[in-house]
């Protein structure tokens, strides 16, 4: 393992710390709820869902966090303004954790940024995400909100190389008038969480691991990804899924360790149902990484898995 020469920033999101040197803080884990075709969702447009089942899933993640010391966030996914409003209200009611607000629609994300500001929850909200498709109206909504934490996505549709992704953040890569980091500054984002973006395997998925190290070395911001999207989009693995679902789950969950070994600070691990597997696996990786840097003057946090589970 290694220690970055660049000073590493530690973001504080509603009391949850993320970032730092490898082995310093436990990995922040975020499971997704209300995702596409989630069986607990009864009406995705209206945001109707099985509240009892949803609370059990949130509790499952919190139990994993309490056991291992790995902090957690709830990754809220909504497709309409009505649905994401209901989802935010529910998560705020049953959990005190930070949460990500995510939608494929920029108008929904913009609405969510205004809504959490109106109800006093902006300090717990992480915007997902500032990316190359962000619109002027979305930038204005985010800038006018009280949100100060956001994922900044390094996806570059024209050039998925390491250079293309880094330039998207720094300069806009010739596709935007300014880099995404500059846009984040204009929006008042203090806690910048860099996501290299996960492309399919065979189309540069592994570049995200290299970019994690490169971005932390260059800027020092907390960096991580939804790395499970690589195996979940792997055609070969999907063909095995029906006859061997355990194999699929092992690869999906196991990808967590790859991001951690590449100095990742946070992981969007996918369906929140996987919390029971992800938290012990992430804790194992955190322990081994902490041991690997023990002679590099990196002191693990008091609630690091190495201090709770060893």
From Swiss-Prot:
Broadest EC class assigned to this enzyme: transferase
Entry keyword set: Methyltransferase, Transferase
GO molecular function: methyltransferase activity
UniProt-listed GO biological process terms: methylation; one-carbon metabolic process
EC number(s) stated in the UniProt entry for this protein: 2.1.1.-
Keyword Methyltransferase attributed: yes
Top-rank taxon: Archaea
Subunit structure: May be part of a complex composed of 3 subunits; MtxA, MtxH and MtxX.
Family as reported in the entry's similarity comment: Belongs to the MtrH family.
Name of the protein: Putative methyltransferase mtx subunit H
Taxonomic source organism: Methanosarcina acetivorans (strain ATCC 35395 / DSM 2834 / JCM 12185 / C2A)
